[in-house]
Curated annotation (Swiss-Prot):
Major role in the synthesis of nucleoside triphosphates other than ATP. The ATP gamma phosphate is transferred to the NDP beta phosphate via a ping-pong mechanism, using a phosphorylated active-site intermediate. It is an enzyme of class 2 (transferase). Its EC number is 2.7.4.6. It is found in: Cytoplasm. The gene is ndk. Keywords: ATP-binding, Cytoplasm, Kinase, Magnesium, Metal-binding, Nucleotide metabolism, Nucleotide-binding, Phosphoprotein, Transferase. One of its GO terms (biological process) is GTP biosynthetic process. It holds the Pfam family NDK. It comes from Paracidovorax citrulli (strain AAC00-1). Belongs to the NDK family. It comes from the Bacteria. This is Nucleoside diphosphate kinase. ATP binds at K11, F59, R87, T93, R104, N114.
């Protein structure tokens, strides 16, 4: 099995609910290690750049507005099959469709305020990790 790194963001809704520790506990219980982490309040420019892939989608403006509405917790998760593991922990994008016990089923309010973001593929993960953690501030554990 390959050790991977993936980007995870705990979104403003979940940060406001004070569930960062509960979400981190789920990552660690699944065998994922936090290799880098920081809290940030994204600027509009950062959010627009990060979600540029969605620029032409009808939800783009609402997504950017939501992501700049409060602080987020950004982390790099590391472990065997980290990308898939994180996506399984998160659950479906729409919390109404998310399996019981997933992060979104337990902490998200809507498809927009859905608690977490996670990279969807190895290539995406590499780009997303570099966006928020350029340079050498990620630590193998």
């Amino acid at each position: 099995m390959a050790i991977e790194r993936t980007l995870s963001i705990i979104k403003p809704d979940a940060v406001a609910k004070n569930v960062i520790g509960q979400i981190y506990a789920r990552f660690e219980a699944a065998g994922l290690k936090i290799a880098a982490a920081r809290m940030a309040h994204l600027s509009r420019q950062e959010a627009e750049q990060f979600y540029a892939v969605h620029k032409e989608r009808p939800f783009f403006k609402d997504l950017v507005d939501f992501m700049i509405s409060g602080p987020v917790m950004i982390q790099v998760l590391e472990g065997e099959n980290a990308i898939l593991k994180n996506r399984e922990l998160m659950g479906a994008t729409d919390p109404k469709k998310a399996a019981p016990g997933t992060i979104r089923a337990d902490f998200a309010d809507s498809i927009d305020a859905n608690a977490v973001h996670g990279s969807d593929a190895a290539e995406t993960a590499q780009v997303e990790v570099s966006f928020f953690f350029p340079g050498l501030n990620i630590y193998a554990r």
